[in-house]
Every structure is written in C-alpha cells, then in structure tokens.
C-alpha cells in the first residue's frame, strides 16, 4: 500500500472510531483511549515517515541512551563517550533520550530499565529495556513544527509527552510507549527595552522573550550582558518557559524582592490541542493566560515562547554562614538552626532574602549553610558586624561557624551560568515541598518550631533540604497579579524543599517514594498543619490531595478551562489539572476499561478490513 493510500486508510479509521465512540456507549463521554505500539491502529512506518517529512526530518526514533553499552548494540567508542557525558547536565538537557537522572527513565520493574549510572567502564552489559523513554521524539525547531506534531499526536491518539530539559522530579518528562515533543531547540532570545503588547500603547517596561528551550544559565548570561537580572531558579539547566514559568516560578534569589515567575510573565505563545498557534496575555485569550500562570506545564498546550519582565542589575553583598555538627547532638543542632532562622526572620523584615541549605555528609555529620542577599549594598564591613550580632547565640551553644561576605558589582554574577556536573554517586533524586505561612514564620516561636522539625527529619547521605524565601513581593503581588496559583501563596513566607536521594535500583525508588510520602512529608506538613500548601514543580510524586495543596479554590476554574481547551485530554500531566480522570500513566480514562476494549477491537477490525 502506498503512502497516500495509507493516509486515506488512516482517515477512514478515524471516522470509524468517531462513529463507534459516539454510538457504542452513549452514557460515557467522551471516550478517549490512547494507542499502544502492539495495536493495529498504531501509526505505520509510512505514516511516521510522512510526518517526519512534514517537520523537515526532525523525528527521531528513541532508544535509551545507554543502549550502546548493552548487547546486541554494544559500541565501545559510543559507550566511552556516553560515560564521559552522562554526568553533564547540559548534555542531558539536550538529549531527548535521557532525563536529568535515571529515576523516571525506568519502568516499574527491573526488566523496564537501561541504567547507565551503574556502568563504570565500557564493557558489554545485558538487559537494556525501553522503560519510560518515549518511542519517538519530534525535536522541533519552530512553532510550526510543534503544530504539526500536536496534530499528528491528536490524529493518532498517541500518548504525548512534552520535554524541554528533563528536570521534572515527578516523571512528567517521560512515559512508556509515548511520543515526545522535545522543545529544547526553540532557542530564541530577544530583549525589549520598553515592551508594549500588540494592540496596546501601555508601557510594561524592560522584558525578554525566550523560546521554550532557553535554559536559565544561558539567559542569566545574556541578561547580564544587557544589564539586567532575571527572576529564575538556582539550577542553570532548567528551561525558563516550561514547567518553571507555568508552574509558579520560585526564585531562590529574587522572589522576596520581585515575586514569583508567574507574577512577572507578560505573554505566552502556545500551541493548543487543536494544533492552533495562539498568543495569550491580558488582552487576548485571557482565560488561557490565567491558567498558564500557575496551572502547570504540559497541561493546556505546548508553550513555544514566553515573555517576562527583567530587572536592572544592581550591586549586592552576599553573606554566607557555615556550621556543622554530628547528628548525635540533636539538641545543640536544633538550637543552631533556630539561631540562623531567627536571623533570617529579622533580615526578611528589611527585605533581605536568604536561603538555608542542610545536607547530610557520608560520615553522618550534618552541615548547614545560609546565604543572605543584601541587594543595593556594597559595605561588607557593616554587614559583617550586623551578621555577627545576629549570630551571637551560636557561641553560647558551642557551635562553630564561619562567616564570609563578598561584594559584587552586579548581583547577576551570583547566578550560576555553568551547567551542573552530576556527582560521582549513582543515585537519582525525588523531591517534595511544603510552604510555611508568614504567620508562623514571623511569630516569636516560629523559627524554633521549624528548627525542631528540621533537626528531627530523617535524612540520609545525599539528601538535601533547602529553603526558598517567599514573603515580600510574593505576598503583595497578589493584589495586582491575577494568577492561577493557590491563593495561599500570598500568605507564605518560606518554602521548604526536600530532595531525597534514590539508590540505583527499582526497589530503591519504590522504598524512597514510600518513605517520602508516608514519613517525611507528614513531618513537614505538621510544622504548619493548617497551611497545607506545596509547590507543584517540586511536589511529592504520590501526593493524593494534589488538587488542594497545589491549587486550592482555583482548581475548579482550572478544571473548567482544561475541559474547554483540551476536552479529549491530549495533554496529560501527572498530578496535573484533569489528571484524576486518567490512569497513572495517562493511557486510559478511569472506569472505561470495557469501553476501551470494545473500541480497540472495533478499531483493529476496521484497520484489518481497510488494509487487508
């Protein structure tokens, strides 16, 4: 059968599917199932080739990157290269067949993975499997190619995955038997000295437009050369316009002073489920704009670029305090944490942000550091004296600490612009977050209560806990920025981020997730039990109450918008808006297994009749 006949056959099959979906079971609508490779209605090689031509040859058939280290595909040179590159976060961001760590590359069992972390030398290994790595990737380079990819996925009922840099800690950047749109090559960057939206004369000030694939570190460097600071995260290989800017956009450096990323986004360009390319801002498609400002990435469409405010670069002094104690001395460690959290509380009142980082070392010593960001300051001597006065009680409880301050002519030089190099450890990570209210943090006993909980939190070597400073403009922006974030963000002061190390086995992942959900998260939520708020971008992958802790009262409206813009659920995002209607991998609507079987049978029958 030639390509044209194949395409005509596919359209006939679609018509049959529409007919049966409408009349087979009238009480359950819409009927939506996704096609799997073993089914006759999976796109044929001719259809994949035709689609590849439509996107200028940008389609890749994916295998796990480590397959070159396994039989029967063993290639020593390629395997050597892989082992050399595998710890480079920049390489991982650009490669559609890997994620930032192995945790969500693997399936549910040992025969659903192709690990590279356990390989130390390029010797032929056995048992490489696809796992959760998508089967195909459209490595798009234009919005028009994104449109073609979305239409292809919709036409053929494919499980669609949107991937930028592969940083998602809940597995949203991969899925078994899926078709990936890889947005990392959308690399436009354009600065505007005085932005005005199309159709408006109102000045919005300096801004930058970035393609979906632009990473934080690259944007930081470009902005610094232009004399600007950008509100972004700590990791330089996170994509700016993807999950970061659609899921909230917490900045460890600037949120206290400038708010959240969603507060400062001015416009999105997006390909919706029907394959249309739209602009969403305060003047057009306002409902969609509201949903994209906090509703989560990969949910309402494929964002191809975004425009956000930038801020004049300023001088700054950064003060860092380091302290360490054995885990066996919990009382002094609790007091030490309380002292530095009291210092953070005091400095927050003067709009000085800070970030606490707690790590457990292999020798089971616990170490903490806290950085304070004094913007528009240059006098290190004065700041050191103030810091010493805030830390006096550390001497009383006999905790040794070091204090160092440095003045920067431009605060942007503090931003990390060099891609991460993964550690030599073979573990991956999962993450979770809990917000602390301003009411608790600013109370007289708040820092002590938080310190006690953090000191008692069971942590293992490789685990990390750090805070992100909210409050300030995060709270006041609630009066002027209409976003879909949980309303409680406008009453939050700190975000506790817990990163849990996962050993290199499926069993380790299962145990780590169970411990995170059932032990550590309840302990963190108990700090401020009436303020149950979490950050979806770094949320517990097993969060059962995700609608409430991520969006609260905004979830109902978000769900309605999802139904209007993507009624068939083409864009599935784990623990995302509308995901409760689907199974855990987004392959089939819940409670429709019988319908799925019937439609699959009819589709297979129709395919065999047309192609037979």
UniProtKB/Swiss-Prot annotation:
Pathway(s) this gene product operates in, as recorded in its UniProt entry: Alkaloid biosynthesis; ergot alkaloid biosynthesis
Enzyme class: oxidoreductase
Every FAD-binding PCMH-type domain range: 129-313
Record flagged with keyword Zinc-finger: no
Reported cofactor(s): FAD
EC annotation from Swiss-Prot or TrEMBL: 1.-.-.-
One GO molecular-function entry: FAD binding
SUPFAM superfamilies, sorted: FAD-binding/transporter-associated domain-like
One Pfam family it belongs to: FAD_binding_4
Keyword terms: Alkaloid metabolism, FAD, Flavoprotein, Oxidoreductase
Gene Ontology biological process terms from the UniProt entry: indole alkaloid biosynthetic process
InterPro entries the record matches: BBE (IPR012951), FAD-bd_PCMH (IPR016166), FAD-bd_PCMH-like_sf (IPR036318), FAD-bd_PCMH_sub2 (IPR016169), FAD-linked_Oxidoreductase (IPR050416), Oxid_FAD_bind_N (IPR006094)
Family of this protein: Belongs to the oxygen-dependent FAD-linked oxidoreductase family.
General function of this protein: FAD-linked oxidoreductase; part of the gene cluster that mediates the biosynthesis of fungal ergot alkaloid. DmaW catalyzes the first step of ergot alkaloid biosynthesis by condensing dimethylallyl diphosphate (DMAP) and tryptophan to form 4-dimethylallyl-L-tryptophan. The second step is catalyzed by the methyltransferase easF that methylates 4-dimethylallyl-L-tryptophan in the presence of S-adenosyl-L-methionine, resulting in the formation of 4-dimethylallyl-L-abrine.
Name this polypeptide is given: FAD-linked oxidoreductase easE
């Amino acid at each position: 059968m030639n390509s044209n006949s194949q395409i005509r056959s596919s359209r006939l099959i679609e018509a049959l599917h529409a007919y049966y979906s409408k009349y087979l079971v009238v009480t359950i609508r819409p009927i939506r199932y996704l096609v799997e490779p073993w089914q006759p209605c999976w796109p044929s090689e001719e259809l994949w080739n035709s689609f590849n031509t439509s996107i200028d040859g940008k389609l890749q058939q994916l295998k796990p990157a480590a397959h070159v280290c396994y039989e029967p595909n063993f290639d020593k040179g390629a395997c050597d290269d892989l082992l050399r590159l595998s710890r480079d976060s920049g390489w991982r961001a650009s490669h559609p067949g890997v994620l930032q760590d192995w945790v969500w590359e693997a399936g549910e069992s040992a025969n659903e993975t192709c690990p590279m972390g356990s390989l130390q030398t390029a010797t032929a290994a056995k048992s490489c499997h696809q796992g959760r790595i998508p089967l195909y990737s459209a490595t798009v380079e234009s919005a028009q190619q994104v449109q073609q990819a979305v239409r292809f996925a919709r036409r053929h009922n494919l499980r669609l995955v949107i991937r930028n840099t592969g940083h998602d800690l809940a597995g949203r950047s991969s899925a078994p038997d899926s078709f990936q749109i890889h947005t990392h090559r959308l690399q436009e960057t354009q600065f505007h000295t005085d932005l005005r939206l199309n159709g408006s004369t109102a000045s919005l000030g300096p801004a930058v437009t970035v393609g979906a694939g632009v990473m934080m570190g690259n944007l930081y460097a470009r902005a610094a050369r232009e004399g600007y600071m950008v509100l972004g995260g700590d990791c330089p290989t996170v994509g700016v316009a993807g999950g970061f800017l659609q899921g909230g956009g917490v900045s460890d450096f600037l949120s206290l002073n400038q708010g959240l990323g969603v507060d400062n986004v001015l416009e999105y360009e997006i390909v919706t489920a029907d394959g249309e390319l739209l602009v969403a801002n305060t003047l057009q498609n306002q409902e969609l704009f509201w949903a994209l400002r906090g509703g989560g990435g990969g949910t309402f469409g494929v964002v191809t670029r975004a425009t956000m405010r930038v801020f004049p670069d300023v001088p700054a002094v950064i003060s860092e305090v380091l302290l360490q104690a054995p885990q066996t001395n919990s009382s002094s460690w609790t007091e030490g944490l309380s002292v530095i959290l009291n210092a953070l509380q005091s400095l927050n009142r003067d709009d000085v942000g800070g970030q606490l980082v707690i790590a457990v070392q292999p020798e089971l010593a616990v170490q903490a550091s806290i950085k304070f960001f004094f913007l528009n300051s240059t006098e290190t001597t004065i700041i050191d004296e103030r810091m010493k006065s805030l830390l006096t009680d550390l001497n009383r409880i006999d905790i040794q600490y070091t204090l160092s301050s440095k003045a920067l002519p431009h605060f942007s030089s503090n931003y990390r612009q060099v891609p991460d190099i993964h550690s030599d450890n073979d573990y991956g990570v999962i993450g979770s977050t809990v917000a602390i209210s301003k009411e608790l943090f600013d109370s007289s006993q708040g820092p002590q209560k938080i310190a006690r909980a953090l000191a008692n939190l069971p942590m293992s070597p490789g685990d990390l806990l750090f805070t992100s400073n909210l409050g300030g403009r995060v709270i006041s922006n609630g009066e002027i920025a209409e976003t879909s974030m949980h309303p409680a963000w406008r009453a939050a002061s700190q975000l506790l981020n817990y990163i849990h190390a996962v050993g290199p086995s499926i069993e380790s992942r299962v145990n780590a997730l169970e411990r995170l959900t059932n032990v550590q998260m309840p302990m963190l939520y108990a700090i401020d039990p009436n303020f149950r708020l979490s950050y979806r971008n770094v949320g517990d992958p097993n969060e059962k109450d995700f609608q409430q802790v991520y969006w609260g009262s905004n979830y109902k409206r978000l769900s309605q918008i999802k139904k209007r813009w993507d009624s068939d659920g083409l864009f599935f995002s784990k623990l995302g808006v509308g995901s409760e209607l689907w199974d855990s991998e987004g392959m089939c609507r819940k409670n429709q297994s019988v319908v799925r079987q019937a439609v699959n049978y009819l589709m297979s029958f129709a395919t065999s009749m047309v192609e037979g």
